[in-house]
Amino acid sequence: MIRTWIALVPNDHRARLIGFALLAFCSVVARAVGTVLLVPLMAALFGEAPQRAWLWLGWLSAATVAGWVLDAVTARIGIELGFAVLNHTQHDVADRLPVVRLDWFTAENTATARQAIAATGPELVGLVVNLVTPLTSAILLPAVIALALLPISWQLGVAALAGVPLLLGALWASAAFARRADTAADKANTALTERIIEFARTQQALRAARRVEPARSLVGNALASQHTATMRLLGMQIPGQLLFSIASQLALIVLAGTTAALTITGTLTVPEAIALIVVMVRYLEPFTAVSELAPALESTRATLGRIGSVLTAPVMVAGSGTWRDGAVVPRIEFDDVAFGYDGGSGPVLDGVSFCLQPGTTTAIVGPSGCGKSTILALIAGLHQPTRGRVLIDGTDVATLDARAQQAVCSVVFQHPYLFHGTIRDNVFAADPGASDDQFAQAVRLARVDELIARLPDGANTIVGEAGSALSGGERQRVSIARALLKAAPVLLVDEATSALDAENEAAVVDALAADPRSRTRVIVAHRLASIRHADRVLFVDDGRVVEDGSISELLTAGGRFSQFWRQQHEAAEWQILAE
C-alpha cells in the first residue's frame, strides 16, 4: 500500500517525501528515547541520589518536546503531500480515461473508475497523517525501543527484538485473512452499486413487466451476494483479531517474565522494573493501534487499488501527426482491415477493404452484429484495427494525435448522450467558438428550432441528466444539430433513426441531406428509408463487405441487399384488418 501511495506522489514533491520520511524516523527515535528514559529516571528517583533524577527528567522533557515538534512538522508535510497526491491523482485519472480503450469500460470497470474519482478525497488527504504515520510507528517504534533497551538490559532488548517479527507477522496474517474477504466484499459492493443504478434507471421497463420488487431483480441477487461477502468479511476478521491478541499476550508474558526474573536475581531494581512495565505498554501500543486501523487500512488499500486499475488500464496509443487546416473533404480508405474485441469469440471485421470518394454519402447496411458500427468507430479513431490500416486522404488514422482524430470526424450516435445543461450548451459543445448564426443554422437544419420555439425557456431549457427532460426524438435532433455545428470534414451517422417514429425519422434524414457543408458522409442504417440519399451502399455481413454499389445497382443484382430491401418494404405494408 505504501509503495502504491509513493508512486502517486508527484515528482516535484519527492524531495518533501524524503524529508517527511526522515522527520518521521526522527520522531520515532525521540518517542522511543523518551520512553526508555523512564527507566534511569525511576532508578535515580528511588536511588541513593534522588537529585540526579532532575538530569534524567530534563532529558525526558527534551525528548518529549522534540517528539511533539517533529510530529507537528511531519503532520503538516503529510497533509501537503496528501493534497498533492489528491490533485495529481484526480488529474491523472481524468487524463487517463479519455485515452483508455473503449472495451475496458465494462460495468465493473466503469464503477471502479467512478469510485476512483469520487471517493478518493478524504482518504488520500488523510492517508499520511491517519494511516502512514501510525503504520510507520508500528513498524519502527517497537524496534527502536528494543534497541534502546539493550544498554539497560541486553536480555530484555533481545526479548523485545524477538517480539517485533512475532507481532508484525501476526498483524500481517490478520490483514491477509481480512484482505481475502475484503476483495470479495469490494467486488460485491461494486456490483451492488451498478445494479442499484440500473434498477433506478430501468423502473419504467421493470414496472411494465411487474418486476418492481428488488428481490425479483438483479438487485436482489446483488444484495444477497453483498450480504454473503460482508458476513464472510466479518468471519475472516475474527480469527485474525484472535491471532493478533494471542501474539500480543505472548509478547507481554515473555517481556514481563524476563523483567520479573531479572528483578528477582537482582539484575534490575524494583523501580527499574516498574518503569519497564510502562515501557512494555508503550512497546505494545503501536501494534494495538494498527490492529484497530486494519479496516481503514484495507479500505485505503482498496481505494489505491481502484486508482491503480484506472491508471494502468489499456490505452489507445495515439500518434503524433496533425490534421491540415482547411475545408478539404477527404477520401476514406480501408486497407485489409481486421478488428476484434479482447475476450471476444472471434474477429468482428476481417479483410475489409473499400475506398470512399471525397464528398460522397455512403450507406453501410447489414444485419445486426455484422460490424457496421465498428467500421464507423474505426474511422473515428475510437478503436484501432488489429490488422490493416484506416486511411483518411492517405494518412493512417492511427498516426494522428488525439486532437487531430477529434477534428476530422463529427459523429451522431445511435443513443445520443446530452450533458446536463441547456440545449444551447449541448449544441455548442461541438464547437464552443461557433457564431450565433452558425448555431441558428444548425438547429434549423436539425429542426431543433421547432422544439426551441415551443419551450418556455427556448434554447436555455435545461435538458436534464443525459437529456432526460427531452423525448428520444428530441434528443436525437439536438445531437444532429451538435454534429452539424462541428466543422469536421467527415460526418459519421450510426443508426440515428432506428428508434424514432416516422416524423422524427423524416426530420433527421432531411437534416442530414440539407447540410450545406461539404463532407464525406458515412451512414450506418438498419431502416433503409434513411439511406435514400446515399450515393453508394456497402452491404456488410459476418464482418465482410459482401456487396458494393449504388442502390439501383444492388437492387438490380438481386443479392443480399435486394432481399433486405424487399423484406423491409413487405414489413412496411403489413396491416391489422378488423373483421
From Swiss-Prot:
EC number assigned by the record: 7.2.2.-
Localization terms from the record: Cell inner membrane
Enzyme class: translocase
GO CC annotations, alphabetized: cytosol; plasma membrane
Induction note: Repressed by iron and IdeR.
This protein's UniProt keywords: ATP-binding, Cell inner membrane, Cell membrane, Membrane, Nucleotide-binding, Translocase, Transmembrane, Transmembrane helix, Transport
Pfam family membership, one: ABC_tran
MF GO annotations: ABC-type transporter activity; ATP binding; ATP hydrolysis activity; ATPase-coupled transmembrane transporter activity; siderophore-iron transmembrane transporter activity
Residues that coordinate or bind ATP: G366, P367, S368, G369, C370, G371, K372, S373
SUPFAM superfamilies the UniProt entry points to: ABC transporter transmembrane region, P-loop containing nucleoside triphosphate hydrolases
InterPro entries membership: AAA+_ATPase, ABC1_TM_dom, ABC1_TM_sf, ABC_transporter-like_ATP-bd, ABC_transporter-like_CS, P-loop_NTPase, Type_1_exporter
Alphabetical list of PANTHER family matching this protein: ATP-BINDING CASSETTE SUB-FAMILY B, ATP-BINDING CASSETTE SUB-FAMILY B MEMBER 6
Domain comment (free text): In IrtB the ATP-binding domain (NBD) and the transmembrane domain (TMD) are fused.
Physiological role: Part of the ABC transporter complex IrtAB involved in the import of iron-bound mycobactin (Fe-MBT) and carboxymycobactin (Fe-cMBT). Transmembrane domains (TMD) form a pore in the membrane and the ATP-binding domain (NBD) is responsible for energy generation. Required for replication in human macrophages and in mouse lungs.
Protein name, per record: Mycobactin import ATP-binding/permease protein IrtB
Gene it is expressed from: irtB
